[in-house]
Amino acid sequence: MSAVTPAGGDTTADRSWPALLNGLLDGRDLSADDTAWALDVIMRGEATDVQIAGFAVGLRFKGETVEEISGLVRTMYEHANVIEVPGKTVDIVGTGGDGAKTVNISTMSAIVLAGTGAKVVKHGNRAASSASGASDVLEKLGVNLELTPQRVAEVAEEAGITFCFAVKFHPALRHVATARGQLGIRTVFNFLGPLTNPARVKAQAVGVAHARMAPIVAGVFAERGHSSLVFRGDDGLDELTTTSTSRVWVVRDGRVTEETFDPRDVGIELVPVEALRGADASYNADVARRLLAGEKGPVRDAVLLNSAAALEALEPGEGALAERLRAGMDRAAEAIDSGAARRVLERWVAVSHA
């Protein structure tokens, strides 16, 4: 049995797996120090798969809290290969899990964002709910992802955009792989990636497919002092969707404000989700190339909208949310139509192989 004395020397409350798991099953919330301890044991390879699975399922059974996830985020960073990227940076990512198999909206949006002049540090992995993951598509577009952390940071300066491949920056997560794979269900580990960008990005647009978790994710960003837009489509997509309305949690100055957003308020007509459907990485990469070449249609609308969400997180404005997003969409459209976004990708490919 693993046990630890909490900070402050409280020897009457030694932490152990039975104590934590019983607490979860009794419906008691854990402290940030509790969850930080548990994940530290896990990431040092000192927990069994049964303990890991019990912890993950117990948290979901009870319902994760902002404080519990904040403790996990703290430990994730302690075990991560973090990098320093000077200046204001932004990330755009989805948690996955919506099962819609759409094209890679956040990946295309990241490139367009960089085309507007924003410095983008994207954190991602293999496929979760898209037909292919960010890394799969970027490889098909020619971006070299086999870079050292130091080189990843340098690429951000040279190209205005870079990609942190989660498995390379959070290697200690290998210890949860077996338990996660055998469980086959959503757990808190599905949400930690978007919360732990290795560059410690302070602005992000994050899509969350799970309704209960979206405001929790927003709360974690607020607790950490970030400027963020967290959203969930009322169709279940982990995007600012164009097939229905969305719920948006605007995080600013440590506070969270919830709003409803209708894409028709920015001139986008609703489309069926099939209009955003993707396929394998080669297909999705071709969609990205056509977008950057100026192709109009539902995919472009979705990319402009999500790019605007990230711009709003990076440079928060005043006034109605729809007005702020409309202004961001205009900037994103100019980045595409001027060729700036396409040139960003070309530069990214070149410097990633230098």
Swiss-Prot record:
Cofactor entry: Mg(2+)
UniProt pathway annotation: Amino-acid biosynthesis; L-tryptophan biosynthesis; L-tryptophan from chorismate: step 2/5
Positions of 5-phospho-alpha-D-ribose 1-diphosphate binding: 94, 97-98, 102, 104-107, 122-130, 134
Keyword field: Amino-acid biosynthesis, Aromatic amino acid biosynthesis, Glycosyltransferase, Magnesium, Metal-binding, Transferase, Tryptophan biosynthesis
Cofactor note: Binds 2 magnesium ions per monomer.
GO cellular component, one term: cytosol
GO molecular-function terms, A-Z: anthranilate phosphoribosyltransferase activity; magnesium ion binding
Principal EC category: transferase
Reaction it catalyzes: N-(5-phospho-beta-D-ribosyl)anthranilate + diphosphate = 5-phospho-alpha-D-ribose 1-diphosphate + anthranilate
Highest taxon in the source lineage: Bacteria
Entry binding sites for Mg(2+) 2: 238-239
Binding site for anthranilate 1: 94, 125
Residues binding Mg(2+) 1: 106, 239
EC number, as in UniProt: 2.4.2.18
InterPro entries (UniProt xref): Anthranilate_Pribosyl_Tfrase, Glycosyl_Trfase_fam3, Glycosyl_Trfase_fam3_N_dom, Glycosyl_Trfase_fam3_N_dom_sf, Nuc_phospho_transferase
Binding residues annotated for anthranilate 2, in chain numbering: 180
GO BP terms: L-tryptophan biosynthetic process
Subunit (UniProt): Homodimer.
Function field: Catalyzes the transfer of the phosphoribosyl group of 5-phosphorylribose-1-pyrophosphate (PRPP) to anthranilate to yield N-(5'-phosphoribosyl)-anthranilate (PRA).
Protein family: Belongs to the anthranilate phosphoribosyltransferase family.
Protein name, entry field: Anthranilate phosphoribosyltransferase 1
The organism of origin for this protein: Streptomyces coelicolor (strain ATCC BAA-471 / A3(2) / M145)
Primary gene name: trpD1
